């Protein structure tokens, strides 16, 4: 958040756009709280993930160790191709829909920045075969937000992408 704030200020972005960029930076990894994702980050160990003081953002696995990653993903039961960005976007969309006042930034751009921060969601996130039905919970601006999983392909994301590109 702080780095994004500095960049947004140095670029002279207007306040609503600045707010959007800062919030996207703060919230883009919310979906990593998924228990399967956390287990994967802990090398496939759900017990270590559950006992952790706070969720990990990175695994610490060597980036080139593909076999270790595949083993961790398999042990964690994280679906192949799962995207934490989809979960982050869903949590933020739920947060926005529950706000008592209108979001002070650009809600469509916010959701798109979150969904696309690893290069996907242009216009759609890839489909994932996810049989893990559960509810994902995260804290956004001090409020608990939930979203049901799995999240399917949302064609409305392509419409949003088109609207953003038409601006």
Provide a role label for each language-model segment.
Residues 1-5:
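Accessory helical-bundle/CTD segments and flexible terminal tails appended to RecA-like ATPase motors
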Residues 12-167:
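Divalent metal-dependent catalytic cores for phosphoryl transfer on phosphate-bearing substrates
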């Amino acid at each position: 958040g702080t780095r994004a704030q500095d960049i947004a200020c140095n670029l002279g972005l207007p306040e609503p756009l600045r707010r959007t960029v800062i919030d996207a930076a703060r919230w883009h990894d919310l979906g990593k709280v998924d228990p399967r994702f956390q287990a994967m980050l802990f090398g496939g160990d759900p017990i270590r993930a559950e006992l952790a003081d706070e969720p990990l953002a990175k695994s610490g696995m060597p980036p080139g160790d593909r076999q270790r990653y595949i083993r961790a993903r398999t042990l964690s039961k994280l679906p192949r191709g799962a995207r934490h960005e989809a979960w982050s976007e869903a949590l933020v969309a739920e947060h926005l829909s529950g706000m008592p006042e209108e979001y002070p930034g650009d809600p469509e751009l916010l959701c798109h920045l979150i969904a696309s921060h690893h290069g996907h969601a242009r216009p759609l996130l890839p489909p994932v075969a996810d049989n893990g039905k559960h509810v994902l919970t995260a804290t956004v601006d001090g409020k608990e937000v939930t979203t049901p999983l799995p999240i399917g392909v949302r064609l409305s994301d392509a419409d949003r992408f088109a609207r953003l590109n038409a601006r």
